[in-house]
Amino acid sequence: MTRVSNLDTPRDKKALLDKKSIISHDDLLSPKQNINDNVSNQDSSTGILDPRLPLNRREIFLLNKSWKGISRNMDIAGVKMFTKIFLKNPELLVLFRHINVQKEDHQNVEAYENSMELETHSEIVMNTIDEAISCFADYDKCHQILSSIGSFHCTIRNFKGEYFLKARDPFLQAVAEVLGDRNSENMQSIYKRAIDFILNTLCEGWKSGIELNKPKYLTTP
């Protein structure tokens, strides 16, 4: 006997198509709409997952939903961030000798935007932030990732942990530009606390690396 598929009847096929239509419609909603529509499905508790985390459950949920919009444009956001960093702190370019921007172009936005080397480096940095945000609810995992990367930077000659903090405002500005009108006051507050945690943990990791490797790595004063 030939087995009849569950989709052999016109009614079943129509039901499947209707279901797909609903999914497609939801996917077309803006990130802002998706965030608002799904918050009610999450734990509305304001309790902190871990007392060392700067965000509660709902805020971490909102951060992850919003970050999806950024992650689709990470290359753009990353270049925007580093361009702002270098425009304000051109002296840091000595740490990025692989980025081919001539001295006379240090205040030229297009020079940074057209740099393939900067785009590549920006992508690496933004992937690190992406990894941290994706596991933000797991303090130990997130802290370990960031501390390890921060510690690695103690091997870079003349690099100082405080340089991480110079990325704070440029990051927030880049996020605001990419999100546009979806960057509500609430999301601004969430991103500020998230990036402060990320950058401070990187800085702490650098300090730990310096302490552990003092005999091997010496930085100039």
Predicted ranges, named:
Residues 1-221:
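Globin-like tetrapyrrole-binding proteins
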